UniProtKB/Swiss-Prot annotation:
MF-aspect GO terms: ATP binding; ATP hydrolysis activity; ATPase-coupled transmembrane transporter activity
Entries under PROSITE patterns matching the protein: ABC_TRANSPORTER_1, ABC_TRANSPORTER_2, CBIO
Stated name of the protein: Energy-coupling factor transporter ATP-binding protein EcfA2
Assembly description: Forms a stable energy-coupling factor (ECF) transporter complex composed of 2 membrane-embedded substrate-binding proteins (S component), 2 ATP-binding proteins (A component) and 2 transmembrane proteins (T component).
Gene (UniProt): ecfA2
């Protein structure tokens, strides 16, 4: 699946005293299998943007072209998947393939645990697939499969989701999206409110899904997470995309991040301090990378002393 965003703008309450332009001439493309972080200060347009990717919102100007395999609607009894494209744009007509788009592009919003509502975890996970026309039998099979993938025991299926901790509820919400088998997975602040261990476990799940070919997009203020896990970073500010590139290249510019109200990754701040003192390290994306680089630097320094 591919998504191409063509010069979209979004205006809320147009021609009114409270008119507000949330997105301004945004053009981006997304390929299957990418792992992307979307960053930017509060109110920069990040959440509004991701709402456009599966037609929860439509642009005021511009369009979004989604290319992939969609069910052929001509034969509703025995639909087959065919290569086609869907164009999302401002229209009064009903958007074709809307269910297919939302099946293939799943979004988990911040504090998704508050979206749980069924009496059991099994029913909550199965709700999405059933609403898309999947049989109950198949939906419950998927619930059993995906609760394990998100790291919860199978015997939780008959429990009420409201008995769980915040982190566990978020895993159930994630399982519900995965049960619809999307190609694109989009998460809005997925680690907000989680402790370090919970954050690590959620990010490891995302990494595994990406390694299996899923496109993973995370909206995050935590640039340490973006640095360690994602390969591409898109930077929003005031409704514009101000940077789009390899994650390390975008986040390494510590001064640029601060100028745009973002706290740089701690590792790269420390790396820059060392660099200013003449200690040059290669690219570091994690604590493990940093420790390895420091050890290598010290070994090289000690060998140089011995030779002298």
């Amino acid at each position: 699946m591919q998504i191409e965003v063509k010069n979209i703008s979004k205006v809320f309450e147009p021609k009114s005293p409270i008119e507000f332009t949330a997105l301004k001439g945004v053009s981006l493309s997304f390929e299957q299998g990418e792992f992307i972080s979307i960053i930017g200060p509060t109110g920069s347009g990040k959440t509004t943007f991701i709402e456009h990717l599966n037609a929860l919102n439509l642009p005021s100007i511009g369009s979004i072209v989604i290319k992939g395999k969609f069910k052929d609607q001509k034969d509703k009894k025995n639909p087959v998947l065919i290569e086609s494209e869907v164009i999302l744009q401002k229209t009064k007509r009903k958007i074709k393939q809307i269910k297919e788009i939302r099946r293939q592009i799943g979004i988990v919003f911040q504090f998704a645990e508050y979206q749980l509502f069924e009496s059991t975890i099994e029913k909550d996970i199965a709700f999405g697939p059933i609403s898309l026309g999947i049989s109950k039998e198949e939906a419950y099979k998927r619930a059993k499969k995906y609760i394990s993938i998100v790291g919860l025991p199978e015997n939780y299926l008959q429990r009420s989701p409201f008995e769980l901790s915040g982190g566990q509820k978020r895993r159930v919400a994630l399982a519900g999206i995965l049960a619809m088998d999307p190609d694109f997975l989009i998460f809005d602040e997925p680690t907000a409110g989680l402790d370090p261990q919970g954050s690590k476990e959620i990010l490891e799940i995302f990494g595994k899904l990406n390694s299996e070919g899923k496109t993973v997009i995370i909206v995050t203020h935590n640039l340490d997470h973006a640095l360690e896990w994602t390969n591409r970073t898109i930077f929003f500010n005031d409704g514009f995309v101000i940077k789009d590139g390899k994650t390390y290249d975008v986040l390494e510019d510590v001064d640029f991040l601060r100028e745009n109200e973002m706290e740089p990754p701690k590792l790269l701040v420390l790396k820059k301090l060392l660099q200013d003192k003449g200690i040059n390290l290669s690219k570091v994306r994690s604590i493990e990378d940093f420790a390895r680089e420091i050890n290598q630097y010290l070994e090289t320094k000690n060998k140089t002393k011995e030779n002298n």
